[in-house]
A protein has these predicted regions:
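Flexible "cap/lid" subdomain of the alpha/beta-hydrolase fold that forms the substrate-access gate
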Residues: 1-8, 15-17, 23-25, 29, ...
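Active-site glycine-rich loops that stabilize anionic/oxyanionic intermediates
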Residues: 35-38
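Typically the conserved alpha-helix immediately C-terminal to a functionally engaged Cys/Sec
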Residues: 45-48
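Active-site machinery of serine-nucleophile hydrolases
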Residues: 51-61
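Catalytic histidine-centered segment of alpha/beta-hydrolase-like enzymes
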Residues: 271-283
Length: 300
């Protein structure tokens, strides 16, 4: 995986981030942020397809993969999306960039959303994969969503309930959660799956990921509420899975129009793990949007 990429560690925001990065430093930078319970390896099919147009930067988020997993606090601020976004801002400044395109999937999309709110001057355009706004998802939760996204409500339980239960057999938990969400038709490559499972066997990673979700249900919502009625100004493109819970449970575009001033989007015929299932489609849509090429937007 990532044959044309370098691997490095960067000291940012008081922690060490593991980063995969292409060496075409004269190209416009784009950051790809992974989701739960994965690592930057989820981009191994998409990232190489972007190299003709971008310098591609793929970090492991704090708490995930080979990045540091700092101890948390009672308010879960250590794993708030604001703190995680500040990691990415510090990373990009250290790499010499003050403006970049931004792509996020799942938890990484939530970090990207917060980054664009707090540091909008740095984000040229943003593509978010298979999420609706977090606060609005909680506010509009019904039994169908709670059933499909059961892990949202399991991982937020008081320490150490989810940590101990997952830690008894992290491989089985990972496979049951992700293979089910992928419709039992997994497109995870052997190398990527090994990286995911190896990373998730770490007790610190399990705890950090629980803290990520605890933050989402508490301090992240508080930060959203502090934003008031101001809408995100960054040009935003939403792609969500026709075979996923977001499509079934929410009016995705309506929720995003409540939060963003310049938003387009569409559903695609895939599952939640679209970057690994239909990488060519996702890569082309990223290129088209972020390079301001004309594209036809349709959504159901």
């Amino acid at each position: 995986m990532f044959e044309k990429f370098n691997e490095t560690y960067l000291e940012v925001n008081g922690i060490r981030l593991f980063v995969r990065k292409s060496d075409n430093v004269n190209a416009p930078p784009i950051v790809l942020l992974h989701g739960y319970p994965q690592t930057s390896a989820m981009w191994h099919k998409v990232a190489p397809m972007l190299l003709d147009d971008f310098e591609v930067i793929c970090p492991d988020l704090r708490g995930y993969g080979r990045s540091d997993k700092p101890s948390s606090d009672e308010l879960h601020e250590t794993y708030s999306k604001r703190t995680m976004a500040n990691d990415i801002v510090a990373m990009m400044r250290q790499l010499g960039h003050d403006k970049f395109d931004l792509v996020g999937h799942d938890r990484g999309a939530r970090v990207a959303h917060r980054l664009a709110i707090d540091h909008g001057e740095m984000v040229k355009s943003m593509v978010l994969l298979d999420i609706a706004p977090g606060r609005e998802m909680y506010e509009n939760t019904r039994s169908d969503f709670a059933h499909a996204y059961w892990h949202w409500f399991f991982l937020t339980q008081k320490y150490p309930i989810p940590e101990q239960m997952i830690g008894l057999d992290p491989d089985s938990y990972w496979k049951l959660k992700c293979f089910n969400q992928a419709g039992h038709n997994s497109s995870f490559s052997e190398d990527a799956l090994k990286e995911y499972l190896d990373a998730f066997r770490d007790d610190a990673a399990i705890h950090a990921s629980c803290e990520d979700y605890r933050a989402a249900a508490t301090i992240d919502i508080a930060h959203d509420n502090e934003d008031g009625t101001d809408k995100l100004a960054t040009p935003l493109y939403i792609i969500w899975a026709k075979k996923g819970a977001i499509e079934k449970c929410f009016d995705v575009m309506d929720l995003w129009r409540q939060r963003a001033a310049k938003v387009t989007g569409e559903s695609v015929d895939t599952t939640h793990y679209m970057a690994e299932e239909i990488p060519l489609v996702i890569a082309q849509k990223i290129i088209n949007f972020c390079t301001n090429q004309v594209m036809e937007i349709t959504h159901d």
